[in-house]
């Protein structure tokens, strides 16, 4: 496709877009997806919203303070002025952001985009080696870092020639202090709608980082598809949740969606599930985004009544078990909104809400997207047949200078790496990540199906299922199981769980290997690390 003339002086991003023949098809079928050629998403989400709703409207809450839209705009503009005039940031240059979810991280995000820069957001948990790899990949020239997380970045910045500025310390060298005397107005760079706004980092099975390139129009597109038609945010909503803003799930649910409708967002740096429920109750939050693990933990802790003000609860990051959906509905009346998205697609593209929800199904294609289940040759399979999930819409995968682009974009579709089946009504039913399908003695076994069966047992708190190599069968089903407190972890319990599973699903799917563990390996954001379970003793 032909791109609009770029406003970027530094053309690194556009120069390293995938070749056109490796792009999936793009579609802008909805009227709300028709954007002008010149578009800066920061201007639309902040300046335009302020003009419509007023400067005094609350924009950002934290446990200690609230910023209005006017305060956020003034501070973002001061930062943008400093980045342009003192740091010398040029349109198109990459700026790495490092910090937890708080108002100043949001101000930095807006400032970079207003100045025409490209945001490379990172979670504070990344260590020096990971930061080095990402900086080398994206050629970032500036880093804005919460002072509490500067240690791992300081040496990396010096070694890579990155200009590093810290915020939040309050001293004379602090970015906030340095920008405090700058003008509170700024003339935003008039970027092209298809200029790169974000480089969203993700990692493959090899661990080598990838960066997906998303345009300014893509940022608005996720709000005008999933945000508008499924989340259905309102100006009086208070959004909150746990995903980092560096993750596209968090970026959409905690920044783009609320700002698109003039709502406010409650930012939490860290929270256990119980603390999350308490915070929801304290602030009267109405839209919640978090992982299935957190919803399950809230239920297990008996904290679900604290979610009384929630009218929309989004679950993403991993498959939502039907049992969790049902328990939440039975105890609170909340219908969890399941969805599947990806960093490559920027956000959720299959989901359902309200009466359209079918518990256990991920949903149907979000308005603006088209989804299908394909075979290995890229041909649609009959309904009810498992195959590769494929999607097209207004966003797509564009890896930064990465040969793995050809694996994700095939036959005009984005191939997500998930195994699904579609029913006759167009609902998509998750089977497994493609690499979570277990082939044992010629049988295809979906790990999540075995997990759901095991979790029906009253002694099982949670579990995870993976393939383990086996000389006779090729692979066997292995389950790492967390038992409820006080339940003995002994061979008798193994046999009991195996027999129980055979009663729930086809006997050939039962876990031939069961390992009791105190906890499942997860990232700091709660996402299960299945790869750590695939090697013996890795779970414990």
Segments (PLM) and residue ranges:
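Conserved AMP-binding A3 loop
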Residues: 68-70, 190, 197-224
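AMP-binding/adenylate-forming catalytic core of the ANL superfamily
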Residues: 126, 143-145, 288, 390-393, ...
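Conserved ATP/PPi-binding loop(s) of AMP-dependent carboxylate-activating enzymes
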Residues: 364-368, 379-411, 425, 443-445
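Conserved pre-ATP/AMP-binding loop-to-beta segment of ANL
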Residues: 171, 182-201, 208, 231-238
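Conserved AMP-binding/adenylate-forming
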Residues: 65, 82-129, 244, 444
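Gly/Ser/Thr-rich phosphate-binding loop
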Residues: 285-290, 299-358, 370
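Conserved AMP-binding/adenylation subdomain of ANL enzymes
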Residues: 220-238, 245-287, 301
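AMP-dependent adenylate-forming
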Residues: 43-68, 166
């Amino acid at each position: 496709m032909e791109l609009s003339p770029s406003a970027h002086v530094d053309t690194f991003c556009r120069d390293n877009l995938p070749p056109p023949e490796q792009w999936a098809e793009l579609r802008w079928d909805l009227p709300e997806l028709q954007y002008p050629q010149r578009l800066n998403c920061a201007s639309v989400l902040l300046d335009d919203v302020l003009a419509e709703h007023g400067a005094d409207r609350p924009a950002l809450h934290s446990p200690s303070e609230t910023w209005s839209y006017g305060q956020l705009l003034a501070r973002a503009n001061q930062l943008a002025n400093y980045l342009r005039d003192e740091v010398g940031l040029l349109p198109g240059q990459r700026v790495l952001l490092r910090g937890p979810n708080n108002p100043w991280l949001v101000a930095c995000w807006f400032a970079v985009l207003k100045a025409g820069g490209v945001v490379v957001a990172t979670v504070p948990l990344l260590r020096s080696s990971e930061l080095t790899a990402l900086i080398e990949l994206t050629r970032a020239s500036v880093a804005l870092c919460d002072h509490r997380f500067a240690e791992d970045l300081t040496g990396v910045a010096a070694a890579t020639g990155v200009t590093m500025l810290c915020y939040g310390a309050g001293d004379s060298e602090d970015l906030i202090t340095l920008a405090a005397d700058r003008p509170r107005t700024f003339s935003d760079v008039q970027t092209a709608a298809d200029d790169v706004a974000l480089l969203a980092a993700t990692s493959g099975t090899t661990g080598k980082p990838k960066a997906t390139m998303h345009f300014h129009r893509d940022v608005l597109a996720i709000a005008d598809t999933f945000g508008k038609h499924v989340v259905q945010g309102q100006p009086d909503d208070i959004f909150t949740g746990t995903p980092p803003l560096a993750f596209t799930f968090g970026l959409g649910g905690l920044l783009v969606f609320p700002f698109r409708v003039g709502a406010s967002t409650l930012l939490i740096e860290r929270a256990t599930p119980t603390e999350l429920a308490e915070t929801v109750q304290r602030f009267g939050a109405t839209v919640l985004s978090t992982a299935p693990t957190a919803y399950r933990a809230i239920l297990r802790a008996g904290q679900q009544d604290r979610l009384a003000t929630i009218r929309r609860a989004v679950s993403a990051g991993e498959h939502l078990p039907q049992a969790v959906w049902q328990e939440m509905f039975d105890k609170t009346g909340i219908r969890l909104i399941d969805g599947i998205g990806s960093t490559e697609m920027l956000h959720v593209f299959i989901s359902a809400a309200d009466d359209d929800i079918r518990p256990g199904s991920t949903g149907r294609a979000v308005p603006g997207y088209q989804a299908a289940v394909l075979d290995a040759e890229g041909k649609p399979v009959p309904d009810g047949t498992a195959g590769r999930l494929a999607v097209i819409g207004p966003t797509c995968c564009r890896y930064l200078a990465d040969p793995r682009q050809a694996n994700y974009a095939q036959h005009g579709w984005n191939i997500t790496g998930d195994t699904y089946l579609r029913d006759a009504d167009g609902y998509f039913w998750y089977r497994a990540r493609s690499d979570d399908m277990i082939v044992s003695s010629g049988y295809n076994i979906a790990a999540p199906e075995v997990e759901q069966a095991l979790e029906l047992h009253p002694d099982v708190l949670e579990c995870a299922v993976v393939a383990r190599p086996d000389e006779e069968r090729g692979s066997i089903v292995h389950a790492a199981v967390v038992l409820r407190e006080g339940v003995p972890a002994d061979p008798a319990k193994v046999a009991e769980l195996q027999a129980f599973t055979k009663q729930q699903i086809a006997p050939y799917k039962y876990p031939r290997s069961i390992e009791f563990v105190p906890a499942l390996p997860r990232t700091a954001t709660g996402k299960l690390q299945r790869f750590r379970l695939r090697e013996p003793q890795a779970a414990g």
